[in-house]
Curated annotation (Swiss-Prot):
Pathway: Cell wall biogenesis; peptidoglycan biosynthesis
Record GO terms (molecular function): ATP binding; UDP-N-acetylmuramoylalanine-D-glutamate ligase activity
Catalytic activity entry: UDP-N-acetyl-alpha-D-muramoyl-L-alanine + D-glutamate + ATP = UDP-N-acetyl-alpha-D-muramoyl-L-alanyl-D-glutamate + ADP + phosphate + H(+)
InterPro entries: Mur-like_cat_sf (IPR036565), Mur_ligase_C (IPR004101), Mur_ligase_C_dom_sf (IPR036615), Mur_ligase_cen (IPR013221), MurD (IPR005762)
Enzyme class at the top of the EC tree: ligase
Record-linked HAMAP family: MurD
Name used for this protein in its record: UDP-N-acetylmuramoylalanine--D-glutamate ligase
Pfam family, one: Mur_ligase_C
Top-level taxon: Bacteria
Originating gene: murD
UniProt KW keywords: ATP-binding, Cell cycle, Cell division, Cell shape, Cell wall biogenesis/degradation, Cytoplasm, Ligase, Nucleotide-binding, Peptidoglycan synthesis
Compartments, as annotated in UniProt: Cytoplasm
Gene Ontology process terms (BP): cell division; cell wall organization; peptidoglycan biosynthetic process; regulation of cell shape
Function as written in the Swiss-Prot or TrEMBL entry: Cell wall formation. Catalyzes the addition of glutamate to the nucleotide precursor UDP-N-acetylmuramoyl-L-alanine (UMA).
Length: 460
């Protein structure tokens, strides 16, 4: 769709979160007639601002006005099966994601990143790499999408030489049809959000694969060859785009001349050694999962033809990401680690593997069909205490109580208090929920900030 095509078009925006509000702003800028429809309460200042600019606004439910539209834009948090979406589809009204909308107006080069785990870390790292190169080349790099900054809120600033590093969830990709990155990366596929996909991991994987559907012959897909689902899907021939596999387990397919891989502590691009892990594994940025994130980031940077020297220097300087195995403080003889970004069991497993020594694990939140058997051995081997918290505390407690001491906490405040009481000296308290945050918090960031605040209140 072209910019001029929006003038006078009727558009319903479903959901007034960050993405929905940014979509409204972009649509209004291009002359669309907008209805913002929110099923819950709406901030009065936001509603007033949009009304003053000519938008219609409704809250506390969706009226039939939603269906008087040329198309709709849906926020990623709105489930696909809710009545308002089903009715839009029944009436054959096109439904797009905010990412799709923003892509119509994007002049910049687009790098797309999706996967179950490592998306935010990898997207942040690639954005830092592109930013470092851009300082030399006179262009800018933007980190947008699921990383927390709506694509629509930045797209008007972007120019042709800029790079938009777009992190994409499966929710956002579901409603993309023409989104076309220059290069894309899939970090991995493990069980997550299966409540949304009828318990079928392949339906979930299909949503992730949509990142590559428009790559075309000039596009490149970087994928994790250590992931059996991705390897089976993309190691075959006959694809319309080129592929770059990466692996932490040595040369991909036994061929040292291709792919990005880790061998003897060195990152290789084909036969070339690029950088040793000792140059970037430090502080909170450690563990084999971060080696995987680095390989994917380097693969994507190479697909974008970014200057190698600047890319590797940006990697050396990368501090890690807030809420992902983030060191918070030493209190009462124990280190406290914030891993609120761990919203599934695989991310919890990665944290358990990365954190050395004995631990107290705080886990729980809103369950997403979790199977804790994947971490049962690690918890038994490393944890002296599990504090099961939030909405899923009973399920978490039942999963681990046969192997380790377990206590339950309804709130995060109680969980921190119980962890502090049970940690003693020399243990690490790891907050790695393995669940969604929506039982008690707005999002994982809100949850992580709350955890850090509670730790800050503890006496040293």
């Amino acid at each position: 769709m072209k910019r001029a095509d929006l003038a006078g078009r009727k558009v319903s925006v479903i959901g007034a979160g960050r993405s929905g509000n940014a979509a409204v702003e972009l649509l209004l800028c291009h002359g669309a007639r907008v209805l913002l429809s929110e099923k819950g309460a709406l901030d009065p200042d936001t509603a007033l601002r949009f009304r003053q600019r000519g938008a219609e606004v409704e809250s506390e439910g969706h009226s039939d006005r939603v269906f008087d539209a040329d198309f709709a834009v849906v926020s990623p948090g709105v489930p696909p099966g809710v009545p308002v979406i089903r009715e839009l589809e029944r009436r054959q009204i096109p439904v797009h994601s905010e990412i799709e909308l923003a892509s119509w107006f994007c002049r910049a080069r687009i790098a797309g990143i999706t996967g179950t785990d490592g998306k935010t870390t990898t997207a942040t790292l690639v954005q830092r790499m592109a930013e470092a190169v851009g300082r030399l080349g006179g262009y800018r790099a933007y980190g947008v999408g699921n990383i927390g900054v709506p694509f629509s809120s930045k797209v008007e600033e972007m120019e042709e030489r800029d790079i938009a590093v777009v992190e994409l969830s499966s929710y956002q990709l579901e409603r993309c049809s023409s989104f076309r990155p220059e290069a894309a990366l899939i970090t991995n596929i493990t069980p997550d959000h299966l409540d949304r996909y009828g318990g079928d991991i392949m339906r979930y994987a299909d949503a992730k694969y949509r990142i590559a559907m428009n790559l075309g012959s000039s596009g490149t897909l970087v994928y994790n060859a250590d992931d059996p689902i991705l390897r089976a899907r993309f190691s075959v021939g006959g694809l319309q785009f080129s592929t770059v596999p990466f692996s932490t387990a040595g040369p991909v397919g036994g061929d040292p001349s291709s792919g990005i891989y880790l061998e003897d502590g060195w990152v290789h691009a084909g036969l070339r050694r690029l950088i040793h892990t000792s140059e970037f594994q430090k502080g909170s940025f450690r563990g084999n999962h971060n080696n995987s994130n680095v390989l994917g980031a380097i693969g994507l940077a190479r697909a974008l033809r970014l200057d190698e020297k600047a890319v590797l220097q940006a990697l050396r300087e990368f501090p890690g990401v807030e809420h992902r195995q983030e060191f918070v403080a030493s209190k009462r003889g124990s280190d406290w680690i914030n891993d609120s970004k761990a919203t599934n069991v695989n991310a919890m497993r990665q944290a358990l593997e990365a954190v050395p020594g004995r631990i107290v694990l705080i886990a729980g939140g809103r369950d997403k069909g979790n199977d804790y058997s994947a971490v049962a051995t690690l918890v038994r081997e490393k944890a002296d205490l599990v504090v099961a918290m939030g909405e899923s505390r009973q399920k978490v407690a039942d999963a681990f109580r046969a192997d380790v001491a377990v206590v339950e906490a309804a709130t995060l405040e109680d969980a921190v208090r119980l962890a502090a009481g049970g940690a003693g000296t020399g243990r690490t308290v790891l907050f790695s929920p393995g669940c969604a945050s929506f039982d008690l918090f707005r999002d994982f960031e809100d949850r992580g900030r709350s955890f850090k605040a509670e730790v800050g209140r503890l006496e040293a």
